[in-house]
Amino acid sequence: MFSLPVLEHQLVMYVTAESSVAFSKPFDLSSVPVVTREQSLAEDRTKKLTTATPTLKAPSAGPKPAPARGSAEAAASASAAAQKYAQQLQAIPELSSYGGVLKSSAVVELTESETEYVVTAVKHLFKEHVVIQYDIKNTLPDTVLADVTVVCTPTAADESEESGLEEEFTIPAPLLKTDEPGTVYVSFRRPEGQEFSAANFTNVLRFTSKEIDPSTNEPEEHGYEDEYEIEDLDLVGSDYILPAFAGNFDSIFNGIPSDDEHEAEETLQLSNAKTLAEATELLVKSLGMQPLEGSEVTLSTSTHSLKLYGKSVTGGKVASLVRMAFSAKSGVTVNIKVRSEEEMLAALVVGGVA
């Protein structure tokens, strides 16, 4: 059967297309992912668990937890974003030969939203390349930014090693007017013979600043070169994982080898999570996998187990069992155990959270 949320989204996009050219071709069902009966049942379980049901217990005091976002809705949103990025990247001549996008990350904020230059980033993973998309907005009035680039320097997660990423080119944004967004792309070649690698990117925004001549309302001919340091960006293990459904988590988890090359484990305190519900939401995003068996819903305020599953961009299985505990004294403590069919990916995934 087809994924109904994605099918609905694609049909809406098709029938509401502004261009008449869209109707010159029939609707393409091949763009809609097919889901199994197990996946459909998993969705039903999630919806039932996240829908309020009558209870005989007296209502408890305190704020009510926010309803969890359905995994079907999240999958549809991610699918739509991935298709949008794929179309945009394929239309860029310098990137058109890279092939299909294996995965695009969520949007990462590299500045505060109130700063003069607002910058976000998306990591696009290809078979042989990593492309970082920087979306930039200049909020300064009466000023334009010309020849906007980002100096992006990768270092390995382990400082004693080389990242292996080789910068090939940068596609600058020619001109950024006030409150008009623009995009800079930086392309790196992935290291040969290394399917998965982690890296940290330092980022510096560089541009020529020009004031607007009030008499002509045009930028002045000459400006001055300037730069603006923005937040670092990390390439982590979860960037190589796509969420996936499965019918029996325990069977999959126990079927993956548990030696040092296939399993990684870490116990840590989550200082930025005040409840198990917050910790669950944070870890689902950080680990980049699909919650199974309704485990994204916390039914206790003291202990919880989160079961996550996904597949790497090369097709290998990845599963994570997260055990959590909360106490008023120590806050949220989590034990994260990840197993992967492919060597060393589990360690990269855990390292991206620790």
What are these regions (language model features)?
Residues 99-132, 136-354:
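Beta-rich interaction modules in large eukaryotic scaffold/regulatory proteins
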Residues 1-120, 129, 239, 252:
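Acidic, serine/threonine-rich low-complexity intrinsically disordered linkers/hinges in large eukaryotic
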